[in-house]
Curated annotation (Swiss-Prot):
It is an enzyme of class 6 (ligase). Its cofactor is Mg(2+). The keyword Ligase applies. Its main location: cytoplasm. Catalyzes a mechanistically unusual reaction, the ATP-dependent insertion of CO2 between the N7 and N8 nitrogen atoms of 7,8-diaminopelargonic acid (DAPA, also called 7,8-diammoniononanoate) to form a ureido ring. This is ATP-dependent dethiobiotin synthetase BioD.
Length: 225
């Protein structure tokens, strides 16, 4: 096994395709002959399936991983209600413990060449009264890959997120443009504006293809380095 490498995958917003991109990156790593595991530290919204509470994002990451490391490590906190995690956690009487997440992450990192840790929602989503996903990325000490959902308003969202990443002392390892809105006007011009303003490599552009599979899209992406 090569030296383990891991990244924190953040997004400019919710519903911009982070999980799809995370799965594609896992497939890209596996295509290059590396073992790869996905992780969703906190997920909100789950269904009772085959005797376990299962979040859809976590299920997709598990399917794209080289092997199943167990949901207790892949998704340490699976909250049932599809609302902001700190609200769901409070309603369910759950306190999100960063130490538990870190232990699960270290277990994954010891088992694979590549670990992709997917955040929840945008970059700064509360996980408790004084703890958010940006704090989690900093605590894990991971460089960040930013997924930009290409739609109207994405330039401001992306640049503000880039500033927030830098403000936390984190490294932006690269960014990925996800064409989530096929009707977006001047999409290429928006992409070029982002390319000129983000001081990090563009790791790929995910095309908008109905019914696309992450394994197919993997060819359009690369991991940093």
């Amino acid at each position: 096994m090569t030296e383990p490498r891991a990244w924190f995958l953040a997004g400019t917003d919710t519903e911009i395709g982070k999980t799809f991109v995370a799965c594609a990156l896992l497939h890209a790593a596996r295509r290059d002959g590396r073992s790869a595991l996905g992780m969703k530290p906190v997920a909100a919204g789950a269904e009772w399936i085959a005797g376990e509470w299962l979040n859809e994002d976590a299920a997709q990451l598990r399917a794209a991983s080289s092997f199943d490391p167990g949901l207790d490590r892949l998704n340490p906190y699976c909250l049932k209600t599809p609302v902001a995690p700190h609200i769901a956690a409070a309603e369910e009487g759950v306190e999100i413990d960063p130490a538990r997440i870190r232990a699960a992450f270290e277990s994954l990192r010891a088992q694979a060449d590549v670990v992709i840790v997917e955040g929840v929602g945008g970059f700064r989503v509360p996980l408790g009264d004084r703890y958010d996903t940006a704090d989690l990325a900093r605590e894990l000490g991971l460089p960040v890959i930013l997924v930009v959902g290409m739609r109207l308003g994405c330039i401001s969202h992306a640049l503000l997120t880039v500033e927030a990443i830098a403000a936390r002392g984190l490294t932006l390892a690269g960014w990925i443009a996800n064409r989530i809105d096929p009707a977006m006007l001047r999409a290429d011009e928006n992409l070029e504006a982002l390319r000129r303003r983000i001081d990090a490599p563009l790791l790929g552009v995910v095309p908008h293809v109905a019914g696309a599979d992450p394994a197919q899209v993997a060819a359009s992406l690369r991991l940093p380095g």
